């Protein structure tokens, strides 16, 4: 048997973390939760000591030896820093790979996992900067979670929509409309050809538009547009609320109105609330759209925080059928390789490690349903060929200003997007190259769609060309 700390005896005092938590000879187990951290130690702190400190402070350690260590098997429960490597091209920057025993975590609780791994260690003085780049959830832990309420295939079956990405639109202005005018905007977009419309992240229940009024007028818009088009329509009714009890009351009312999908701001509301809502959605046959409001506060800086791929994986465990993922081509931050890496982590069942896409660990989801990525933020019809090529069919392409900003109004804006999408999907299915021929494909479609022609003319010069801050 390996010699444990208990067998070695107790000696009071402070000792280097690496004596206990740096274990370069350790081989991770299939049941271990693995984490990859990017870190920069303070001057004078060796990389192995800093890596060990991260393992200690995110698992069983504290700053001094304590006699109660003798009451348990520390070697069994401690986090183990099993590998450290320098970050290529960066001075005093390293990756630390840490293995955590499965027993450290409560089953089915993203809240507990994050509280353990990132809850305290990010304020540790010995570390100048720290970022959680990736997590490998072991299958044994994955199986304790419900995950998405329904998943991609069930959603397509419920909505009877196949063979193409789905189209959405965020209603603008995001704040200030009365409930009736809001419902009117929803109706115009849906009758024009969109599959979904959406509450913005900060629409909850404000004085100018109380939630119950909004739900009622939106329900009228959905039922009317469905009757006119013969297609199933949806609107992401934001049920995010000050309390979980109020959140569930709003969700129940949406269900009573026959709404197929609701929405939640999972970061600002918290993982406990989100998991509660996801389980309710599974039990009640309601789809769940997830907005990532506040994510850039956590994930945008490349040297400190949590990468969005970790947040996306945590959301898949907690539960959501849609998740905003960036666009690559729009107004919001998003490197292409990295974005496609975490999009696969959202949708696929098994993803191999691929550092070129930021995927540090092979992840097996054990048949857990996938999450539809939602491309949203500064996109318009000229982006359609690239979006179809990048995201494929299993996605939601969401045009807010790119629908409502059409010179002829909401319904023509929706029609322009639908025509552009159908043209790109047909061209792709015929074997045409969307990257090389995308402009020609759109112009050809615009010849028989005046709505698309007007949109192409309006936004032909609009681009968002800024350097991505978070590069691999």
Curated annotation (Swiss-Prot):
PROSITE patterns: RUBISCO_LARGE. This is Ribulose bisphosphate carboxylase large chain. Changing residue 212 to S: Forms stable homodimer in presence of RbcX2 but does not form RbcL8 form. RuBisCO folding and assembly commences when the nascent large subunit folds with the help of the chaperonin GroEL-GroES. Monomers require chaperone RbcX2 to assemble into RbcL8 octamers yielding RbcL8-(RbcX2)8. RbcX2 is displaced by RbcS; as RbcX2 is removed RbcS mediates the ordering of an internal RbcL loop (Thr-64-Leu-70) in a catalytically active conformation. The basic functional RuBisCO is composed of a large chain homodimer in a 'head-to-tail' conformation. In form I RuBisCO this homodimer is arranged in a barrel-like tetramer with the small subunits forming a tetrameric 'cap' on each end of the 'barrel'. Keywords: Bacterial microcompartment, Calvin cycle, Carbon dioxide fixation, Carboxysome, Disulfide bond, Lyase, Magnesium, Metal-binding, Monooxygenase, Oxidoreductase, Photorespiration, Photosynthesis. The active site is at 172 (proton acceptor), 291 (proton acceptor). Binds 1 Mg(2+) ion per subunit. Heterohexadecamer of 8 large chains and 8 small chains; disulfide-linked. The disulfide link is formed within the large subunit homodimers. The exposed C-terminus binds in a cleft in the RbcX2 (shown with endogenous and Anabaena strain CA protein). RbcX2 is displaced by RbcS; as RbcX2 is removed RbcS mediates the ordering of an internal RbcL loop (Thr-64-Leu-70) in a catalytically active conformation. One of its GO terms (cellular component) is carboxysome. It catalyses: 2 (2R)-3-phosphoglycerate + 2 H(+) = D-ribulose 1,5-bisphosphate + CO2 + H2O; D-ribulose 1,5-bisphosphate + O2 = 2-phosphoglycolate + (2R)-3-phosphoglycerate + 2 H(+). It is found in: Carboxysome. Mg(2+) binds at residues 198, 200-201. GO terms for molecular function: magnesium ion binding; monooxygenase activity; ribulose-bisphosphate carboxylase activity. It comes from Synechococcus sp. (strain ATCC 27144 / PCC 6301 / SAUG 1402/1) (Anacystis nidulans). HAMAP family: RuBisCO_L_type1. Belongs to the RuBisCO large chain family. Type I subfamily. Its EC number is 4.1.1.39.
């Amino acid at each position: 048997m390996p010699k444990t700390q208990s067998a070695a005896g107790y000696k009071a005092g402070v000792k280097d973390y690496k004596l206990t938590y740096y274990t370069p000879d350790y081989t991770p187990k299939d049941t271990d939760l693995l984490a990859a951290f990017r870190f920069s130690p303070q001057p004078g702190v060796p990389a192995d000591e800093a890596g060990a400190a991260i393992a200690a402070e995110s698992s069983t350690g504290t700053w001094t030896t304590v006699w109660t260590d003798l009451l348990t098997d520390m070697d069994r429960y401690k986090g183990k820093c099993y590998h450290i490597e320098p970050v290529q091209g960066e001075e005093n920057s390293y990756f630390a790979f840490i293995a955590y025993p499965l027993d450290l975590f409560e089953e089915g609780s993203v809240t507990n996992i994050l509280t353990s791994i990132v809850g305290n260690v990010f304020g540790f003085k010995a570390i100048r900067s720290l970022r959680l780049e990736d997590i490998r959830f072991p299958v044994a832990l994955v199986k304790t979670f419900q995950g998405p309420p329904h998943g991609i295939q069930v959603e397509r079956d419920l909505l009877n929509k196949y063979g193409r990405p789905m189209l959405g639109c965020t209603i603008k202005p995001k704040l200030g409309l009365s409930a009736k005018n809001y419902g009117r905007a929803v109706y115009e977009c849906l009758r024009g050809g969109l599959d979904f419309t959406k509450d913005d992240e900060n629409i909850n229940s404000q004085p100018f538009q109380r939630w119950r009024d909004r739900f009622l007028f939106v329900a009228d818009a959905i039922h009317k547009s469905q009757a006119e088009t013969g297609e199933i329509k949806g609107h992401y009714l934001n049920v995010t609320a000050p309390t979980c009890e109020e959140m569930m009351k709003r969700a129940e009312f949406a269900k009573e109105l026959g709404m197929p999908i609701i929405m939640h701001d999972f970061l600002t509301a918290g993982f406990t609330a989100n998991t509660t809502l996801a389980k309710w959605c599974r039990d009640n046959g309601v789809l769940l759209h997830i907005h990532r409001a506040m994510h850039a506060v956590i994930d945008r800086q490349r040297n400190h925080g949590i990468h969005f791929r970790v947040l996306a994986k945590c959301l898949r465990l907690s539960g959501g059928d849609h998740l905003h993922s960036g666009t690559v081509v729009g107004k919001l931050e998003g490197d292409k390789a990295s974005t496609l890496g975490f999009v696969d982590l959202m949708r696929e069942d098994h993803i191999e490690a691929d550092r070129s896409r930021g995927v540090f660990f092979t992840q097996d989801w054990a048949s857990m349903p996938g999450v539809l990525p939602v491309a949203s933020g500064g996109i318009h019809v000229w982006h359609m060929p690239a979006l179809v090529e990048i995201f494929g069919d299993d996605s939601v392409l969401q045009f807010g200003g790119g629908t409502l900003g059409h010179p002829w109004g909401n319904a023509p804006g929706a029609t322009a997007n639908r025509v552009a999408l159908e043209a790109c999907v047909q061209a792709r299915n015929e074997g045409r190259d969307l990257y090389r021929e995308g402009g020609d494909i759109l112009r050809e479609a615009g010849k028989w769609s005046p709505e698309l022609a007007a949109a192409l003319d309006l936004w032909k010069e609009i681009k968002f060309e800024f350097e991505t801050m978070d590069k691999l």
